Amino acid sequence: MKTRIILLVVFSFCLLGDTFAKRKVEEPPSDRQQWADLCYKIAQPILENMSKGELQKNMQLELSPTWDGRDKRVAYMEAFGRLMAGISPWLSLPADNTAEGQQRRQLQEWALQAYKNAVDPQSPDYLLWEGPTQILVDAAYIAESFLRAPDATWKLLDEVTRQRYIQCFKGLRIIRPAYNNWLLFRAMTEAFLLSIGEEADRFALTVAVNKLNEWYLSDGWYSDGPEFALDYYNSYVIHPMYVEILEVCKAKKFLTPVSTVLAICRMQRFNVFIERLISPEGTYPAFGRSVIYRMGAFQTLALASWKYGLPEGLSNGQVRSALSTVMRNMFSIEGNFDDKN
């Protein structure tokens, strides 16, 4: 009898051990792995195709029923510029042999060739640098990607490519920006030129910095132009670009009426509000124009987590968990990706 009991106990432990082993194998990927995998899934179709000069041939455009008839080629710069502004800091991490490290290395190789093709008139993926005013917006994101991670982007480009970007950015000066957050797009390309020692339009920088300071309302919120609009543009554009432009001005001893420290404090106050919009279930209210920019609504939280630290009362784990849950909810829905990603 005792022998049977002992055998049953041993057998039970064996079953439990097998169960625990299976559980270990079936554990979901970490938050970090999910972020890295999602970044790769979004970036790979754009960068791989563009590195081969095949983005404009293969990218499937979806046009709104209310499309205004503008040149469709603005979509290619929009896809490339905004992608690189988002992932360039990630690509600047030190190389390693992890699965994530291999993803970063591959994306960076594609990105460097894509940067080259974007300004090469002989490339099928030469981007649209003249014409619609929208190109000012998306060129600013390319400039922002250089500012955010120069060692992984700008400094690795050949001299011919760098000179082409300089001329393309200067060529955008003929575009008159709208009297709202677009002043920052105009200023972003000039801030980048200033950062690399090129001649910059200091008047454009002054106007943008001064006007945004005038449009600051209170409690972390800027007005997007003379009139306030309740949307996510404080996170999409205003706080991130304003802070980054001011950082360049400070580094280059270009005097401004507002300090980088103050601008960051304003952004951190905004972060307190924006984090509280995320529900325990990982949802957030959809309001205001451009709501389809999705995770861009929390760019200020991501920027602070990466570069400045979070405001008092917000922990890294709290923000990481909130953003991870939002991403899982958003990108697990069918229709985000097609069979070609």
PLM feature segments, named:
Residues D71-E100:
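N-terminal carbohydrate-binding/catalytic regions of secreted carbohydrate-active enzymes
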Residues Y76, I87-W90, R104-M267, R276-A302, ...:
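Aromatic-lined, polymer-binding surfaces characteristic
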Residues K307-N341:
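Extended polysaccharide-engagement surfaces of secreted carbohydrate-active enzymes
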Residues K52-Q56, D96, A178, P280-T283, ...:
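Intrinsically disordered or highly flexible coil/loop and linker segments, enriched in small
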Residues M1-K24:
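Bacterial Sec-dependent N-terminal signal peptides
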Residues K22-E78, E109-Q113:
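Low-complexity, Ser/Thr/Pro/Gly-enriched N-terminal "stalk/linker" regions
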Residues N271:
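Glycine-rich phosphate/ribose-binding loops and adjacent secondary-structure elements
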